[in-house]
């Protein structure tokens, strides 16, 4: 079914840990496309520091030239909150017969019951959970029950059905976080080797994470 990986986030800023996770999942799960969706107004997180259009530009620069990496600006263009269920509904309408795989990290998965209309997500897409090696999935509560009901260890299920499965995959964990990158830049330090050079240059040229913006 030519699965599409959907990788949303604030990307404030995007860095090599994001890109490595996307690349490993693309290779391991045989995803023809990883679509990055920078959030415009994320309802479940603190407001981003950098402007939405600037973060979009960062993602475009970071993914340029990588086969199968694409960027979708629909959430940036929205005036209101960017709910994942709404974005997936739009994508499902556009790709009625395609397998959609929503990529989330471990922390996001554990907070899933707090998401808007979270039980509807699996009606629209598969859920791919990227986690640290050695992490154990919850065995109790709503997420434990959901994993018993919807969990799969078969990559083929992501290709043979449009939605409804949860697949958990261990990825290399680079110890980089957007918060730490912003703090480092705010202290006047160089973020070289934490992100692609084109993203670094844009950040330094715009001073979007200068000390006055992070305190």
Question: Where do the language-model regions lie?
Answer:
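Nucleotidyltransferase catalytic core that binds NTPs
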Residues: 1-215
């Amino acid at each position: 079914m030519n699965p599409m990986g959907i990788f949303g986030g604030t990307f404030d800023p995007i860095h090599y840990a994001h890109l490595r996770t996307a690349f490993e999942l693309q290779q391991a799960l045989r995803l023809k496309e990883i679509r990055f969706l920078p959030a415009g107004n994320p309802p479940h997180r603190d407001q981003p520091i950098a402007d939405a259009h600037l973060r979009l530009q960062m993602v475009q620069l970071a993914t340029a030239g990588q086969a199968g990496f694409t960027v979708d600006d629909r959430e940036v263009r929205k005036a209101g909150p960017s709910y994942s269920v709404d974005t997936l509904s739009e994508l499902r309408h556009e790709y009625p017969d395609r397998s959609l795989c929503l990529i989330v990290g471990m922390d996001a998965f554990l907070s899933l019951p707090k998401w808007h209309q979270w039980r509807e997500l699996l009606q629209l897409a598969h859920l791919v959970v990227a986690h640290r090696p050695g992490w154990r999935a919850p065995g109790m509560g709503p997420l434990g029950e959901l994993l018993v009901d919807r969990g799969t260890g078969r990559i083929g299920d992501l290709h043979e059905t449009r939605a409804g499965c949860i697949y958990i995959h261990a990825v290399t964990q680079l110890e980089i976080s957007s918060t730490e990158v912003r703090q480092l830049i705010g202290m006047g330090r160089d973020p070289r080797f934490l992100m692609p050079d084109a993203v670094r240059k844009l950040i330094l040229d715009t001073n979007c994470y200068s000390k006055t913006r992070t305190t």
